[in-house]
Amino acid sequence: KMGVMGMTIPKEYGGLGMGVTSYVRVLEKIGQYCGSTAVLVSAHQSIGCKAVMLFGNAEQKAKWLPRLCTDWVSAFCLSEPNVGCDAGGQETRCEKTEDGEFYILNGEKKWATSGALSGLFTVMAKQKIKGKDGKEVERVSALVCHPEMEGVDIYQKNRSKCGIRGTWQARIRFNNVRVPKANLLHDEGKGLNVALTCLNYGRCTLSAGMLGGATRAMDQAIKWGRTRYQFQRPLADFDLTQQKIARMSAYCY
């Protein structure tokens, strides 16, 4: 009702149209109370639907962004069982059909934040395309998929983690999924640009939520230092406690 899931989405698509500064302030406040909610909101807007916002055409934005403001959570499918920080080393593959109307998508994605809840996935996959010299090369393309597509299998939903258990990570298999050509984001072979641009936004905004959690922890430590007495004096009177609080304050700043 408050529009938090559509904070950065333009107003013409039903969002609030917030800039980055306003957005990170909200995330910082959310992070003070619930890390899981901060991750859910940030993953949805910073890397999930951000690809559609930045690289979608007018038709794609009009089709998907209103749903992403209201009843859809989005997921970013980049990491794979054998592919982590090497974003260009995708083993998931897509191949165009002979009539050029679909991409046939095959592969597996891992650690997709909110993937078990999402109505829209941005999926990175290697595709054979012709290079500038006319030779065939493999490049990453970005495709939009939905969980109801035939061949999409969300076969593992994980909340058994050390923390942030309010988010559902997922492992997703794509088995001969027919993705319409209209679901291609940006251009063929430009998916790595899509992925890295979205990750840059995520680094900025997710860190705001973590800052909120750190600030909250510092506030609690200060409160405890003032109210907890040992040796007939509050803990805040001891030099070691003051040094620790000062260090926490410096890190938060």
Q: Model-derived features: where do they sit?
A:
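Buried hydrophobic positions in well-ordered alpha/beta secondary-structure cores of metabolic enzymes
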Residues: 3, 10, 26, 57, ...
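Short Ser/Thr-interspersed hydrophobic loop/turn segments at strand-loop and sheet-helix junctions
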Residues: 27-31, 125, 145-150, 176-179
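A short, Trp-centered hydrophobic/proline-enriched beta-strand micro-motif
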Residues: 70-78
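Short Gly/Pro-enriched turn/cap motifs at secondary-structure boundaries
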Residues: 82-85, 111-114, 134, 161-168
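A structural signal for short hydrophobic beta-strand segments in well-ordered beta-sheet cores
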Residues: 92-96
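A short core secondary-structure module
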Residues: 101-102, 106-155
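Glycine-rich beta->alpha junctions and the first turn(s) of the following alpha-helix
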Residues: 154-253
